Amino acid sequence: MMSYIGLQQDSGEYKIQKIHAREILDSRGNPTIEVDVFTPKGFGRASVPSGASTGTNEALELRDADPNRYGGKGVLTAVKNVNTIIQKELLGLDVRNQREIDELMIELDETENKSNLGANSILGVSMAVAKAAADSLNMPLYRYFGGSNAFTLPVPTMNVLNGGKHAGNELAIQEFMIQPKGAETFYEALQIGAEIYHVLGKYLEKKYGRSSTNVGYEGGYAPKMSESTEALDALVQAIEEAGYTESEVTIGLDAAATEFYEEEFYNIDGKKLAAPELLDYYVELVNSYPILSIEDPFYEEAFEDFEALTNELWDTIIVGDDLFVTNIERLSRGVDMGAANALLLKVNQIGSISEAFDAASMASRNGYTVIVSHRSAETEDTTISDLAVAIGAEMIKTGAPARGERTAKYNQLLRIEEDLGEVAHYVQL
């Protein structure tokens, strides 16, 4: 991680000359923040995503709460914070000193969850600073982040069927994903995923009608289904019809269980299940379908239940998203307990590039799988693609192979693989 090894000596060529933020729209038509950072030698632009189902322990995304603009979701306060408070403190600093800049912004905020300046303000600047540094050094972002060790392409875990908060159907589980882990290259993996996606669309239209191919926030189909097994059967059918086997393409679930947890019970498939019953339910699914990973299978504070499922399904990837919120303190607790065995890394959950790297490093040191992730409300920003390669993430989760804000990330990974040439290595799970 080149930008994290000590402080760089001052050089006027790399000093921040100007920072400018603006309000733009995300993929759900809501405002978000975009930040430009200028140096004499380079330029960086970054825009910040937003989640639909969010963990209560995430860093705070600052919204205006003005009902007369965008239903209260404007971000002009966050924009102003960047253009005044943050810019004033960062002008003249060396963009190569990422950690120094991130820590200064965190100190300026003076809260645990970045609620004064806003995690969206801080993250927008943090990402734009990194991009400006890479551009100033005439270096690809993945190489700037990861140095000579950045050559691994992650397995895409593609959300092709949507439920929960990402769709308007009755499926409790939020995401049903395909994982082309048997591919030889990322290029091939993307082709496999796209082929299955289109076969699935035809299957759904034939069985459920044309409206079943309407898509959710992340590009996945949102058919009128009510039970998880119905969705899983459709995925298995599509994988087979596309000409692939269960060893080549596995299935991932994002339960987002906090969203269907109520008064110590989980409402799923028309049933009200206690945690031990839900655990048995997941075990049955894994025994019946080629499921490789389950994300957020329980309520976000249920560390003990995560631990129990991780022990029960020891060869399944149990992912902590709302459980960990990319926070090293919560991740440390999970590691100590053996709760989950994978980290979902979302930079906007924690609010800075440096802290995201810290979480990824802790996860990897402790044998956890790292999955870099988008959010449901995205932009065309591709920073997470470079980040995934830089940290050697085993997987990347950035939606279906559809919708421009999703394919932007996949297409960036294709470019990186091409740039790496023969040294590129596609992860083998």
Curated annotation (Swiss-Prot):
Binding annotation for Mg(2+): 254, 295, 321
Catalytic activity from the UniProt record: (2R)-2-phosphoglycerate = phosphoenolpyruvate + H2O
Cofactor binding, note field: Binds a second Mg(2+) ion via substrate during catalysis.
Keyword field contains Ubl conjugation: no
EC number: 4.2.1.11
InterPro entries named among the record's database cross-references: Enolase, Enolase-like_C_sf, Enolase-like_N, Enolase_C, Enolase_CS, Enolase_N
UniProt cross-references to PANTHER family, sorted A to Z: ENOLASE (PTHR11902:SF1)
Purpose: Catalyzes the reversible conversion of 2-phosphoglycerate (2-PG) into phosphoenolpyruvate (PEP). It is essential for the degradation of carbohydrates via glycolysis.
Protein name as catalogued: Enolase
Organism of provenance: Methanosarcina acetivorans (strain ATCC 35395 / DSM 2834 / JCM 12185 / C2A)
